[in-house]
Amino acid sequence: MAEEEPQSKKLRPSVISDFIYTDNFQRLFDEHWHNCKDVKLDNIEIISKPFRVCRISNFLYSEDVMDEIKNELLDVKCRRNCLDLYQFEQTSDFVNIDSEYLRLLYQTFQTDLTVWMERITKVELNKKVSMSSSCYYDTDYLLCHDDNMGDRRIAFVLYLSKNWSASDGGALDLFDTDENGLPRNVVKSLIPEYNSLVFFEVTDNSYHQVAEVIASDKSRWSINGWFHGPLREDTRPPRPEIEPNYIEPLNDRINLRDWVTECYIYPSIVKEVQKEIERDSFTLLSNYFKDDVYEKLSIDLTSDSIVWKKVGPADIRNYEVADETSLPELLSKFYNMFKSVTIFQLLKDYTELDLISETETMNPKMAIELQRWSSGCYTLLADINERRSSNYGRLSQTEEIPEVSSLEVLEKSREDQEKTSANYESKSIQSESNTPESMKGDNDIDEDEILKKILKEKSSNSNSNSKKKLSRQSSLSKLDSSSPQKLARSLDTDDSDVSDIGDYLSDPLDNSLENSDQEKDLDDANTSDTGALDVIIQFNTNHMAEEEYTIDYVNPKQLEGTLIHVPTKDNHLCLVYKTLSTCRVHKYVTHYCTDYFYNLICTYYE
């Protein structure tokens, strides 16, 4: 009796269902794909808008093959990828995996399927295929991007999870584009279908995302990658800038004592703030606004009269901004206060920036946004100079910025406060020509109580994790170890194209740089890069964990790029002096955030 044939020799030459090679299937595909006509049948769906996408159902020929592939994947090491753009788990490229069925699948894509794909799509391909497996758990996502990089020509996804539904999240969302070719809204969503292959040509408008997974007891499993081909000529027009609406200081005179906790406008306290800003480029001042005023503002923010407008483009940002003409009266006064020369003067005193015009050539200005945030909102890492010059509008970074860090809450001695109070009636922090009338002492304010709060805040911060994240660091190696850029580079170690998903966000860095060289570069940048001052006030954040949805200031090209974490805190005034190449990134808001929160963000320019 002859010996039984080895299992590897029993395998079919391909694991793909035969029906895709039939004349009828290929005629059907050709008629609808190339004529941009929609069709949906048992084994095929073609979507023509916003860009052409094909889904083939029952793609692998048997359930046994699918089970073998999934079993082999269980033994493949995954890594956790976390960045502003994405959060999920991923294997290395299958070119480096030698298990039986995964190797067969990879070889089939590299040979038979490449030939078939090139023939039916008329897209020129070579034999290079990038392939890996991804797994998305609860709160994982991959935000808006176009895959349009290098020699990628056709993107594909093979779905491995059974019984997936729309209520589980994780859909493949397709974006339409505006008149500038930038992503706008999700107009089509494909629910992951077990044993289906979805593919589309990588083009200038192939913007898509993996929506956040919201199932707590399921994982979204897939095999994905790209077919590669010759480089195409770049035909995309330059990416338009997002132009802020710059506002010059209004000659309105504001009585700050109506709004601000009094100690923060005492000259001695102002001087202390200035020292801290000069040293650390950052401050976080607690209980900055009067409690009753802050509470009324918080209520006003929930008014149905406010008109909110979503802002994009989706590959840069997704949140809502208030129409200032629709704000309730008190909130409108508060909003407009930040345009006033009074606030410009106060911020000049806090920072010594040239925010008050003293000559005709000086032109201080500001921009302001009242933002509403909820589940699904985000901003992404994007370099200003790259957006101005790049035809592709890639999210790559080219600038160096100086190290910045935080300010601990002010601690002022009792004696100094008494001295300040005695001199307060005759001395104003504002210049005589540009600011409101001098502010006088107010016996209604309990100075001792305010100072106790400040000291208590400092004490609590010194024993918290946030203090570690916000305190000044002596070297780059001591910056927050979970910074996005560090994670990306520690996880993405393969040479494979699949492993380079981080290339959407950054250029490779020379990791051999010594700390001294890095610090020298930062010092050089510090003397040459123009700066601006961010002012941040947050509302309705008490329902969130303090470190859950921080606003991060990131140097995109620095090895450990996160410089500052701004925690979510109500009634705090945050000041950050930043260089213009610094990116302000607000973390993606997951489905566990069930209420709105608000940011008033102003940026002041000398």
Annotated model-derived regions:
Residues 2-606:
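Fe(II)/2-oxoglutarate oxygenase catalytic core
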